């Protein structure tokens, strides 16, 4: 059973130490907020242009598959998604590198979006979705799969004299049901597609969608000057160091001390990045 302190660490970033957080995690939060402000000022013209609907890929409107996750219907929608995604994304980025994590976000958005559209052709042809919540569920299922090997049960409680256990592997479906009950207007099918994509990511079934590491290294070399300029603001995790860590055995979060699991991850200082916390062979809404 995970402790309350672990849950708090996952859910709430400490704004007082924001310069110690990964570049993409911070940048995505700021960028999506700016897009929200611009979208609201333009009477939601941007979100209408990039919202995902079931027929979009069949009409070759492919930009929607990548960009629908960047827009939100309002401040509350944005805040819930950013709070839910911030810490899981930071953990992933610290282990896998900044650019690689950006590619992962796009891969998850596209795979979840395609599933949503294929099912939607039959069940909800006129529904449109936007937002990061599908990716939140993707990282939830990704981590659930990784964690269940060492922590098969995430929570145990008593009900009418019987002990009930919640398997770690299937815990995302509990959150799916809770979200559906508490937020009736949320996209059940979009969240379900996000869960599916997270499992596919953890199992390595969508690794063919990733560019070779040489391409990422080439991009980083070309952007070395602006990357160095970011070091005083956020932590940039380079592909060169991340490559060495993807083969390291997974370091479970639930079975370790919650404080050290999230705090003992080195940060970048000066001109180089210190060693990563290993997360194993990893890859890489609504």
Curated annotation (Swiss-Prot):
The keyword Transmembrane applies. The chain crosses the membrane at residues 18-38, 66-86, 99-119, 122-142, 164-183, 188-210. Its EC number is 3.4.21.105. GO terms for biological process: proteolysis. It is an enzyme of class 3 (hydrolase). Keywords: Golgi apparatus, Hydrolase, Membrane, Protease, Serine protease, Transmembrane, Transmembrane helix. It is found in: Golgi apparatus membrane; Golgi apparatus, cis-Golgi network membrane. GO terms for cellular component: Golgi membrane; nuclear periphery. It is a multi-pass membrane protein. Disulfide bonds: none annotated. The active site is at 133 (nucleophile), 191. Probable rhomboid-type serine protease that catalyzes intramembrane proteolysis. Belongs to the peptidase S54 family. This is Rhomboid-type serine protease 2. It comes from Debaryomyces hansenii (strain ATCC 36239 / CBS 767 / BCRC 21394 / JCM 1990 / NBRC 0083 / IGC 2968).
